[in-house]
Amino acid sequence: MSVLESIIDGVREDLAVRESTIPFDEIKQRSAAAPPPRDVMAALHAPGVGVIAEVKRRSPSKGELADIAEPAELAADYAAAGARVISVLTEQRRFGGSLADFDAVRAKVSAPLLRKDFIVSPYQVHEARAHGADMVLLIVAALEQVALEALLDRVESLGMTALVEVHTAEEADRALEAGAKVIGINARNLHTLEVDRDVFGRIAPGLPVEVLKVAESGVRGPSDLMAYAGSGADAVLVGEGLVTSDNPRTAVTQLVTAGSHPACPRPSR
């Protein structure tokens, strides 16, 4: 069993518990009653290379990354430093995240929020919207094509934006076939957890100009953002590099500054 398969098994078990507590019909009603989602596309289309800053306690590859006692305060620092979107992990077993973290961040910041989890069910999409999500992660490697297309349609029908994550050219083709408007290219192989920063440069040039391209994993500082920008990145998603830094707010500021610097390659959108 791969790491991804193991994570998804746990996600399904935890999902079953939540569904037994709050039935699907009720979570759908809550999602319909939630305030309208924020415009993620407008945020990511702003000039320069954007930063999606992540609240991340743990990872399967590194274990404990940071003791984040106040996720809302961390998110507020990210937003104040210029992050365009805040990503919040809600997977609990491997990443130490929770919907409680998400709720705390939502109550604190006005920036668009990405629910970062392993979405395998329409229930989770409505759950994300009910908790105030504006963007939802869909991982191509975790989904059959029919499920990917159905979940993407569900996300967009609720007014949210899908970040469709790929790691190979074949997965990118599947994402495009499903109608993805924002594609995240993850340098990390979710089956083996190995990181290859060259993956972005191999896949991004083959994507249509109108598709927003997000570089995921492997961003340790401004030079990595610049490198990804040179390969066509419209934005970078950064978690570990921020939460393990001495000053996460300063780290975001440095990335945002790099993304708007005249020397930074311009996104070709």
UniProtKB/Swiss-Prot annotation:
Instruction: Output one GO BP term.
Output: L-tryptophan biosynthetic process
Q: Which UniProt keywords apply?
A: Amino-acid biosynthesis, Aromatic amino acid biosynthesis, Decarboxylase, Lyase, Tryptophan biosynthesis
Q: Which Pfam families match?
A: IGPS (PF00218)
- Please name the InterPro entries in this protein's record: Aldolase_TIM, Indole-3-glycerol_P_synth, Indole-3-glycerol_P_synth_dom, Indole-3-GlycerolPSynthase_CS, RibuloseP-bd_barrel
GO MF annotations in UniProt: indole-3-glycerol-phosphate synthase activity; phosphoribosylanthranilate isomerase activity
What EC numbers are recorded for this enzyme?
A: 4.1.1.48
Q: Which reaction does it catalyse?
A: 1-(2-carboxyphenylamino)-1-deoxy-D-ribulose 5-phosphate + H(+) = (1S,2R)-1-C-(indol-3-yl)glycerol 3-phosphate + CO2 + H2O
Q: Which family does the record claim for this protein? A: Belongs to the TrpC family.
Q: What's the protein name?
A: Indole-3-glycerol phosphate synthase
Look up and give the organism this protein is from: Saccharopolyspora erythraea (strain ATCC 11635 / DSM 40517 / JCM 4748 / NBRC 13426 / NCIMB 8594 / NRRL 2338)
The coding gene here is trpC
